[in-house]
From Swiss-Prot:
One of its GO terms (cellular component) is cytosol. This is tRNA modification GTPase MnmE. It is an enzyme of class 3 (hydrolase). The gene is mnmE. The lineage of its organism: Bacteria, Pseudomonadati, Pseudomonadota, Gammaproteobacteria, Enterobacterales. Pfam families: MMR_HSR1, MnmE_helical, TrmE_N.
Length: 454
């Protein structure tokens, strides 16, 4: 669709509400104002006016705001009509506007997309709008605001600027090889490169924290029937989310709970007990359990402490460990410490974490929560932090790889041309985060996930 069309959409959630807002952006915004309001409101002043139908009858009355471009959210002429939040009224007003020539319904995220295309926002800031709307905790919301205000973008621009300066220095060394000073081997370029790499690593650390705030951690509780998996889910959730009985195989399907640990979203999944299925329903539940296990960030291997003294996962259940993906982190949870009398606590056993607790009494649950937070490297101190998406982490990782390869070319062979190319590729990867270098396909995928009115 053309970006020169004038677009309109409801900017408030669908359904009944005290206020409903329609947003118009584009060249015909002033025409819409004249047709619906009978006048063009004074720019950036709230005007209380009737909203007129084509025959002059009043559809609604409310506040009109007019923002001439380029001093608007999208950089275009923008008109906002704030009326009553009834769906019928808003639909009538929307139809009235769409009947005017040159108007069409906005695509999801098109207002933010136009703001990006008109240099009102960079891509990271535009994404922060959607992240702010979707924030599930206070920390996530504050970090999204920081990103919207440019905290993440500033860090990326600083890295890009440092790489630009370094590239100029390297290119000069390549173009003037006859100079008395060998810029490639005198240590100055390596020192600057090491500085950029250190700064990038710091940004990656902060971005991982931002990603955890946004994406959270997926934890799957797995084990044999009657090990206490559902009791652990209830203890972590702080409510009776799952049915708990003494009958083995009570849980037949996947149960999901979403909680927060100091602002980090935790997606807890309780699964059917793993064993030879006794019927088709249980077989399907066990298949779903393994599907969730394979996609987890961490598995809580639930063990009934009254049935074994073993603490090594392979000794407890070798078949289970053999099927687990080799890189999947697990924590062995020895349950029923209130019965066995085991000392509550967390230890390390041959590279695996082992925690002793009682899901029934809740003893040791806080220790498990802290363990999950620390295992992901999450810190609750997000002052000045920013949110990050998976694509941001991938771009930062790619940039780090190019810088590492460039460093290798420099110290092993003083290969200026190869170093310059790696610096260029690293800079390109970083520029994808803010949208200075992005494909149309990437932009389409990002903005299509936004709300219609954004």
């Amino acid at each position: 669709m053309s970006t020169t069309d004038t677009i309109v959409a409801q900017a408030t959630p669908p359904g009944r509400g005290g206020v409903g807002i329609l947003r118009v952006s584009g060249r015909a915004a002033a025409t819409v104002a004249q047709a619906v309001l009978g006048k063009l409101p004074k720019p950036r002043y709230a005007d209380y006016l009737p909203f007129k139908d084509v025959d002059g009858s009043t559809l609604d009355q409310g506040i009109a705001l007019y923002f001439p471009g380029p001093n608007s959210f999208t950089g275009e002429d923008v008109l906002e009509l704030q009326g009553h939040g009834g769906p019928v009224i808003l639909d009538l007003l929307l139809k009235r506007i769409l009947a005017l020539p040159g108007l069409r319904i906005a695509r999801p995220g098109e207002f933010s997309e136009r703001a990006f295309l008109n240099d009102k926002l960079d891509l990271a800031q535009a994404e922060a709008i959607a992240d702010l709307i979707d924030a599930s905790s206070e920390q996530a919301a504050r970090s999204a605001v920081n990103s919207l205000q440019g905290a993440f973008s500033v860090r990326i621009h600083q890295l890009v600027e440092a790489l630009t300066h370094l590239r100029i220095y390297v290119e000069a060394a390549i173009d003037f090889p006859d100079e008395e000073i060998d810029f490639l081997s005198d240590g100055k370029i390596e020192g600057q490169l090491n500085g950029v790499m250190a700064d990038l690593e710091q940004v990656r650390t902060e971005a991982r924290q931002g990603s955890l705030l946004r994406e959270g951690m997926k934890v799957v509780i797995a084990g044999r029937p009657n090990a206490g998996k559902s009791s652990l889910l209830n203890a972590l959730a702080g409510r009776e989310a799952a049915i708990v009985t003494d009958i083995a195989g009570t849980t037949r399907d996947v149960l999901r709970e979403h909680i927060h640990i100091d602002g980090m979203p935790l997606h807890i999944i309780d699964t059917a007990g793993l064993r030879e299925a006794s019927d088709e329903v249980e077989r399907i539940g066990i298949e779903r359990a393994w599907h969730e296990i394979e996609q987890a960030d961490r598995v809580l291997f639930m063990v009934d402490g009254t049935t074994t003294d073993a603490t090594e996962p392979a000794a407890i259940w070798p078949e289970f460990m053999a099927r687990l993906p080799a890189t999947l982190p697990i924590t062995v949870v020895r349950n029923k410490a209130d019965i066995t009398g085991e000392t509550l606590g967390l230890t390390e056993v041959n590279g695996h974490s082992l925690i002793r607790l009682s899901a029934r009494t809740g003893e040791g649950i806080d220790l498990l929560r802290n363990h999950l937070k620390q295992s992901m490297g999450f810190t609750s101190n997000t002052e000045g932090g920013f949110l990050a998406r998976r694509r941001h982490l991938q771009a930062l990782e790619t940039a780090a790889q190019h810088l590492a390869q460039g460093h290798e070319q420099l110290v092993s062979a003083y290969a200026g041309e190869l170093l310059a190319e790696e610096l260029r590729l690293a800079q390109q990867s970083l520029s994808e985060i803010t949208g200075e270098f992005s494909s149309d396909d990437l932009l389409g995928r990002i903005f299509s996930s936004f709300c219609i009115g954004k």
